[in-house]
Swiss-Prot record:
Enzyme kind, highest EC tier: transferase
Region: Alpha N-terminal domain (alpha-NTD), residue numbers: 1-231
Keywords: DNA-directed RNA polymerase, Nucleotidyltransferase, Transcription, Transferase
Protein name: DNA-directed RNA polymerase subunit alpha
Organism: Campylobacter jejuni subsp. jejuni serotype O:2 (strain ATCC 700819 / NCTC 11168)
Length: 337
């Protein structure tokens, strides 16, 4: 039986099962009923459309005028050669978004993906077949390999390259071969009405499934960020998360939990210090300036605060100082009430 709530439960469990170098199962739970598919479906679409990959975008073959031409000494015609070429999955070495790579083969030979590896690019499906040439053939071609997302048709590539020597290719950039999801029922706090999302991601080897999933998440966050300009949701979520994190530390506990000597405790109590977090927010000089706090008590407090991981005047809190101050003020107001 469900309780009446004012907000949906935020999932807390997340696992990644790497089945192989190219396949992974990514699970998250527990989701409220209906929330699983609400998040899984757009993530699946983004895995296909927004994951960065590499593809050949254009080719120039010496002695070949167009893709329907033939080449002396090569078993395949040019059209079949290009089909085989587009099946090769490239990676650019280094940080470049585009590489123009030259290849040359001569004499009787079967050419595979591994034969195109060089200092500029790598073919991840090394055993993929490309072409066969005889002893009289000399195959020379220049290939443009680019980084991108999704799919770009050859008509658009042709306009972008604007070079009649090159044959434009349909560019399939996405390295995600398959992305599926299952929504499973999961028991949470004795309640079976929660969901578990299981995403199965398969890539072609250009990137790992984990990297593909991270790309999809980043794309989703960026697309949703436009709404944050007017709603400030991200700040609210961050503050809520930080508040929860603070509650899990000693900072919101009473100073009695520090087991201070009676002299040190009484001095802090008279100064109105109630919570451990107040000591972390003070500088050493501010603490030393408390009325009747001697050097022995000062050293005792400093040592104990350091032992719990929050030295007096700690820089750990950084941006969370205001949140901690507000939380302490809220607790004090509740106690006074």
């Amino acid at each position: 039986m469900r309780n009446i709530t004012t907000s949906a439960y935020t999932p807390t469990e997340f696992t990644i099962e790497n089945i192989s170098d190219t396949v992974a199962k990514i699970s998250a739970w527990p989701f409220e009923i209906g929330y699983g598919i609400t998040l899984a479906h757009p993530l699946r679409r983004l895995l296909y459309t927004s994951t960065i990959g590499y593809a050949p975008t254009a080719i120039h073959i010496d002695g070949v005028a167009h893709e329907f031409d033939s080449m002396r000494g090569m078993l395949e015609d040019v059209a079949l050669f290009i089909i085989n070429l587009k099946k090769l999955r490239f990676k650019i070495k280094g940080d470049s978004n585009k590489e123009i790579v030259e290849f040359s083969f001569k004499g009787s030979k079967e050419i595979y993906g591994k034969d195109l590896n060089n200092d500029q690019v790598e073919v991840v499906n090394k055993d993929a077949y490309l072409a066969t040439i005889n002893e009289d053939a000399e195959l020379k071609f220049t290939l443009i390999v680019e980084k991108g997302i999704g799919y770009v048709p050859s008509e658009e590539i042709k306009e972008l390259i604007n070079d009649p020597k090159f044959i434009a290719l349909d560019a399939f950039f996405t390295p995600v071969r398959e992305a599926t999801y299952d929504i499973e029922k999961v028991l949470f706090e004795d309640n079976p009405d929660y969901e578990k999302v299981v995403l199965t991601v398969t890539t072609d080897g250009q990137i790992t499934p984990n990297e593909a999933f991270q790309n999809a998440l980043e794309a989703m966050y960026k697309q949703l960020s436009v709404f944050d300009k007017i709603t400030n949701v991200r700040s609210v979520i961050k503050n809520q998360a930080t508040s929860n994190e603070l509650e899990n530390t000693k900072l919101l506990q009473n100073i009695t939990d520090l087991n201070l000597s009676a002299r040190s405790y009484n001095c802090l109590e008279k100064a109105g210090v109630v919570y451990i977090g107040e000591l972390a927010l003070m500088s050493v000089s501010e603490l030393a300036g408390l009325k009747n706090l001697g050097k022995k008590s000062l050293d005792e407090i400093k040592n104990i605060m350091e032992s719990i991981g929050f030295p007096v005047g700690t820089s750990k809190l950084s941006d969370n100082k205001e949140i901690l101050k507000n939380k302490i003020a809220e607790l004090k107001a509740q106690n006074e009430g």
